[in-house]
Amino acid sequence: MFSKLTSILQHAVEALAPSLPLQEDFVYHWKAITHYYIETSDDKAPVTDTNIPSHLEQMLDILVQEENERESGETGPCMEYLLHHKILETLYTLGKADCPPGMKQQVLVFYTKLLGRIRQPLLPHINVHRPVQKLIRLCGEVLATPTENEEIQFLCIVCAKLKQDPYLVNFFLENKSKSLVSRGALSVISEDGPKGQDPGSGDVSQCQQPQELSGATGVEPTESEEEPPHQMDDLSASLDDLNVTSLPEASAVRPNQDYNLVNSLLNLTRSPDGRIAVKACEGLMLLVSLPEPAAAKCLAQSTCLCELLTGRLTSLYKALPQSVDPLDIETVEAVNWGLDSYSHKEDASAFPGKRALISFLSWFDYCDQLIKEAQKTAAVALAKAIHERFFVGVMEPQLMQTSEMGILTSTALLHRIVRQVTSDVLLQEMVVFILGEQREPETLSEISRHPLRHRLIEHCDHISDEISIMTLRMFEHLLQKPNEHILYNLVLRNLEERNYTENKPSCPEDKDVVENGLIAGAVDLEEDPLFTDISPDNTLPNQEWICSPRTSPDHPKNDGKTEVHKVVNSFLCLVPDDAKSSYHVEGTGYDTYLRDAHRQFRDYCAICSRWEWPGAPKPLEKCDLEAAFFEGHFLKVLFDRMGRILDQPYDVNLQVTSVLSRLSLFPHPHTHEYLLDPYINLASGCRSLFSVIVRVVGDLMVRIQRIQDFTPKLLLVRKRLLGLEPEGPIVDHITLLEGVIVLEEFCKELAAIAFVKYHASATP
């Protein structure tokens, strides 16, 4: 009470007294602080019971006022005094000793406000950046301390200053070889790591030491400096009496270069206060984005950031229940790493493990965004660490297991993070993890060369329909990612030589016949008003190739519309009229696929535009047509499943045809020829998508004859699928009937894709 009254009286006296020049006023407030330590006999009283906070605030106000009154960039006498007399060094010492109690908090606030409110660059001064660096080491030493909030605010203002002037980061890459001791190693390797873990044990030993940054700072951060000014002798002696300078530091030797700003932030990411942890993550996000190569190298090699990311991913993944409903994994709300707040009591759609799932997806999102923002060197190092320690070390064993429930859950999680990833660097590591790096053509005897790829493709044809559907969905989303290696590894590498074709002249008259009969009831594209809906303004840039036969050197060149007319009708007329039901139901015509096909093709063209794909198929005379053709493991499984479309569940058929339609959308001449050209001369023993469908139709025509009332039953099933008819008694041959409906719709979709591609390439 008495100290508060004293403070009030002091403010009153200062207000009534004549104003002093700024420098005298500044020195007065500083000496008032130093005199406290010289004269005090009670070092147990909290700092809030003294006038120290008021004097520090007055000093800040004077520095700000001085800067506002002077020319931009000019250093005033008060700032000169602060720098010359090493006031920040002294405050650091007082804060480290926390004398009087609460002084550390006051020092952190002073540093934070000084860096935040003063516009001129302070960090290049050795008497600023060195005490700042020392104060950084004090942050995050102990979690859940009363100063945690001030610590994170101080660290974040330092990060913000480095973001403004990235070269300043070199002042914070400490050369530890000249130091005898430094603080102990961090314990942020994993969530379970004990505080103060021995630096020679566990994952800490994996933090490599980078080469020293010679001359990076321009200032040698030696410990020997000029003697402090004479007027500070009394204060120094008093501090000695208070044992401020005798506090021991840990004796563990750090690497040659240390990035303590990162280390302190890493510690604070483990704070039990979620707001502090998020702020620490934001600070790390700023640091990894700095363009300085030396800082990026030090961050990747001399800090435990990689261990933090992978360790927490691992622990959160392992905390998930052994089995989670795939639908829950797929539909859980979009997760943003900074908004990882979840209340089970307030959630009407809660399910077992939702809290753990959101935590895992939230942290994965943070890793993804961190790598996306990071400088290239740091981004690659972080992504490779996640690949090796999390994808291979944790996820792969789960994906390779034999338990159906385990396979389903782990595949659903893989599917979710494939959908979620946005960083190109992390996506590349994920693609290599799933598919491997192979780019040479596949052979049947070597399809298991990359075990995980082989296992996942095999799961597309698993005895469990749920596993098949989930794996197919994962591949479908993978194919939508902007990475050239995905399609090349799965499909293109096997089509490079076009050895699925036989180089022989074709007969023009053969084009008027489809393999299951004449083109009856063909759609006249030129008279259909729906084709004019895709205006020239909405088309893609002109391509050198189109998906109709006129692009192939094997076929005579006719009028383009005639050729695409025949291609479209080849697909539309594959399913015999007796097996068609869409024309009985309004709104299910072929035209319904045109808009979707146009939008999807435009999206794929945007993705693939930077991959420098050829504008036309490789000339046959340059192809090795004698080499044995193998469509590749992925297409083999898809074609096999397509061949069984009449005997598979409806949901499986939908997913198989969805993946095949995705493949047919890619603007590469070889995939178009192989998947969308009905007229290619297939080499002996080879099959294409069209030929697979033709075999299915042949089987269908035989089986139709054995089913009574086939057409009425087919129409009833279609209406039930569309919700136009209520569910009733089970219809005989329901699997076959649903397969026929999917087949008809798939042929219409392929016809629409073929036309949209022709239209896009033919429009000037």
Swiss-Prot record:
Region ranges (Disordered): 190-236
Coiled-coil segments on the chain, per record: none
Family matches, as InterPro entries: FHIP, FHIP_C, FHIP_KELAA_motif
Disulfide partners: none
Compositional bias per record (Polar residues), positions renumbered to this chain: 203-214
Pfam families: DUF5917, KELAA, RAI16-like
Family of this protein: Belongs to the FHIP family.
Task of the protein: May be required for proper functioning of the nervous system.
Protein name per its UniProtKB record: FHF complex subunit HOOK interacting protein 2A
